[in-house]
Amino acid sequence: MINRRQVLQGIGAGAGALSVNGVLATSAGNRGFTHGVASGDPLSDRVILWSRYVPGGNVARAENIIWQVAYDRAFGDIAASGMTSTHRHRDFTIKVDVTGLKSGRRYFYRFVIDGHRSETGSTKTLPVGAVDRFRLGVASCSNYPQGYFHAYDDMAKSDLDLVLHLGDYIYEYARGRYVNPIAE
């Protein structure tokens, strides 16, 4: 049987191996972007982009946050870009309504501030008129200890036109009453 100390030692050794391969160095590049990125409310010519940037120290405002939307993952062909800011009263969340996009097209997006980049997200505008095929992913009720989060990974790897998240789980169990004891 493996004990807690062995697991923690294994994690420490694994983290050292990751930094050799550059994975942790990449993560350090997005310092401050603690909640990833998201997109939503797509129309045929626009989409909302979201992220959260947490500046260090006792800062009230984060300015000069660059947002970029590109046709390619490498951001060699920029479709739209701009600058925005956020502040403590918004919990440092960033929300941008990107307009002037082409319909039915996949885009890649990110946020940049002081040399730190967010993760790269992927979004798609809605098509205009009738389409031969429209692939929809649907998710709901995400109870972390009950798992099955690999389904989100499968959706991310699929060529979906839209992902609709219907809501989240209502955690109605009393303490000590979870279906899975790992939840405690």
Where are the predicted features?
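Residue-level detector of intrinsically disordered, flexible termini
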Residues: 12-16, 24, 79, 84
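Bacterial Sec-dependent signal peptides at the C-terminal "C-region" and cleavage site
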Residues: 18-31
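N-terminal secretory signal peptides and thylakoid transit peptides that target proteins
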Residues: 1-15
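Generic signature of intrinsically disordered, low-complexity, basic-rich segments
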Residues: 9-13, 21, 35, 75-76
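Divalent metal-dependent phosphoesterase catalytic cores across multiple superfamilies
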Residues: 28-184
